[in-house]
Amino acid sequence: MALEITPALSLLDEHHLLKEVVNEQKLTFENVTYDSRKVSDNTLFFCKGNFKPSYLTSALEKGATAYVSEQKYAEGMDATGIIVTNVQKAMALLGAAFYGFPQNELFIIAYTGTKGKTTSAYFAEHILAKATDKKVALFSTIDRVLGNEPDQRFKSDLTTPESLDLFHDMRAAVNNGMTHLVMEVSSQAYKKNRVYGLTFDVGVFLNISPDHIGRNEHPTFDDYLHCKEQLLVNSKRCVINGETAYLRDVYYTAKATTEPEDIYVFARKGAQISDNIPVDIEYQNDFEDLHKSVIEVKGLSDKAQTLHVDGKYELSVPGDYNEGNATSAIIATLLAGAKGEDARKTLDRVHIPGRMEIIKTKNNGTIYVDYAHNYASLKALFAFLKQQTHAGRVIAVLGSPGDKGISRRPGFGKAVSEEVDHVILTTDDPGFEDPMKIAQEIDSYINHDNVKVEFELDREIAIEKAIKMSTNNDIVVLAGKGEDPYQKIKGVDVPYPSDVNVAKKIVEEL
């Protein structure tokens, strides 16, 4: 790939980002990066984030010929300096241009929501894999799948990658023969302009509840909601969960840039929908247990009926809250050209790493491993499992990450108080915080009249305690980490076997 400086400057000027060019030269860039360790000859280097001038010095020594920044640097006096008003926006635009605008060669379904993004994205990816003969890429919190070969699947570092990485991966997916892409879009992706300039073919808004609010994330809930809603502003067609909080705000944000005939609202049958906003598609539970569920979906509006969505669908991922996730995936993929039969033949065999993973025992109940990590997702998970216990207990093992998401901790205590019988508070990516202080903070929000509370900071021992204390009718929930193979401690990813592997090993030894 290559990018000439003249069209690059024109693109920045078109978006009113270009302030000035220092030492302009006729250049062709053969590499783009924001990481000085990845610089090669003829690189366009981006000065972003926690930038130090020494990074620019290093980049120029390694072959960078120009830099993009919001200010001039003396260290770059011999190179071309492209000075912009917003380096994150500039990086997104020039990244797309460098990689040949790969988004134009993909049908893109994008998901946002406080909870359910990953599960919904996996549902949609499985349906499209059937519909397109496996020509679908997936960018999720768990995996980046760029093709069908083992070496084209990678673990994700961010829910939505930095823009240069995003467009690099899109180009790789196209080169690998992919025609469709399902991706998660976080609120931070809009906050930090990682998806600036992107228009999605279908944007799905699942839900919104207070989360990711704190010193390192969103300053207020209004800012969080605004960033979430930008997905709808930048989508050709919108799919909205009619049961979301702030539905009026969400719906009319979508309507500001999208014609009503291209907005599809779905909801559970009988749900109370605010402001008389019309529901296009409804779903209802036909069967559920601890291992699967069956939903019936029906199109109500004329536009919904043209999708031929009506029918029953069996889901291999249990949980009443996953029924709405599956419905959203069915609608989005039908808009992408799939058929209802594609969904019926795939939704009953979807496996999502770290989401409602079930481990059975002979005499110690059933173990569930789930990534649930905020009040909304924990409440939904615990409530569903409590309903299924048949007089047994719900025993939970959980903690809260350090350095971010501090506003989640009261919600953790609230969810535990409402649905859990016994909780062991433990370590979950404490970062630079004291894990005991985090656990004690969660504990301060727990109603001790309802819940027995223990502290065990060694997560493996906490899991062992929970499993060994459980009996046949009990359910053990290992929440928050899913299949994460590490603990983030003081800036280091410390290896950890994962909740799934720890639980399986303990069960084998019982």
UniProtKB/Swiss-Prot annotation:
Subcellular location: Cytoplasm
Residue positions where N6-carboxylysine is found in the record: 228
EC number: 6.3.2.-
Post-translational modifications: Carboxylation is probably crucial for Mg(2+) binding and, consequently, for the gamma-phosphate positioning of ATP.
Gene Ontology biological process terms from the UniProt entry: cell division; cell wall organization; peptidoglycan biosynthetic process; regulation of cell shape
Similarity field: Belongs to the MurCDEF family. MurE subfamily.
Name under which the protein is recorded: UDP-N-acetylmuramyl-tripeptide synthetase
Organism name: Ligilactobacillus salivarius (strain UCC118) (Lactobacillus salivarius)
